[in-house]
Amino acid sequence: MKVKSSVRKICENCKVIRRSGKVIVICSNPKHKQRQG
């Protein structure tokens, strides 16, 4: 899980979603997991 100020999609499988007020990226590739913070 990377914590970044600006999250963006890295590949076409990445999905940007909001979870309890936080913007996160989920993907089939675990290296692409990101959270805004």
Swiss-Prot record:
GO biological process: translation
Domain of life, per lineage: Eukaryota
Keywords in alphabetical order: Chloroplast, Plastid, Ribonucleoprotein, Ribosomal protein
Cross-referenced InterPro entries: Ribosomal_bL36, Ribosomal_bL36_sp
Subcellular location per the Swiss-Prot or TrEMBL entry: Plastid, Chloroplast
Family statement drawn from the similarity comment of this UniProt entry: Belongs to the bacterial ribosomal protein bL36 family.
Name this polypeptide is given: Large ribosomal subunit protein bL36c
Gene from which this protein is expressed: rpl36
